[in-house]
């Protein structure tokens, strides 16, 4: 008999995470590594677990993630977004809780490009009156 799996794709900055939820004991595997080996910050790990905590499904599913692009913060955000989307497949009743916490909305903030004539995206060179 085939095992039940739930899929979700999450994105944040330049990171894309493909998430699979499989009934299990709550392990989170990111790119074939345990999440504690892959993501160095405890705060980011807590952020990743947020959708599972809100829906009270923390120990019920193993989370298998394939993520690429960006840095640790962007990847953690993408994983969180993917888990939230996969949980909707598990039970559509979770939508209200996840939506209220803002976990279903794709965070569209990305780094603004540097413009010529300026030091950064908006920072102008120092102005000298004389």
From Swiss-Prot:
Any matching Pfam family: Ribosomal_S9
GO biological process: translation
Gene Ontology molecular function terms on file: RNA binding; structural constituent of ribosome
Disulfide bond found in the keyword field: no
InterPro entries reported for this sequence: Ribosomal_Su5_D2-typ_SF, Ribosomal_uS9, Ribosomal_uS9_bac/plastid, Ribosomal_uS9_CS, Ribsml_uS5_D2-typ_fold_subgr
Entry-linked PROSITE patterns: RIBOSOMAL_S9
GO (cellular component) term, any one: cytosolic small ribosomal subunit
Keywords: Ribonucleoprotein, Ribosomal protein
Family (UniProt): Belongs to the universal ribosomal protein uS9 family.
Full protein name: Small ribosomal subunit protein uS9
Organism name: Geobacillus thermodenitrificans (strain NG80-2)
Gene name linked to the record: rpsI
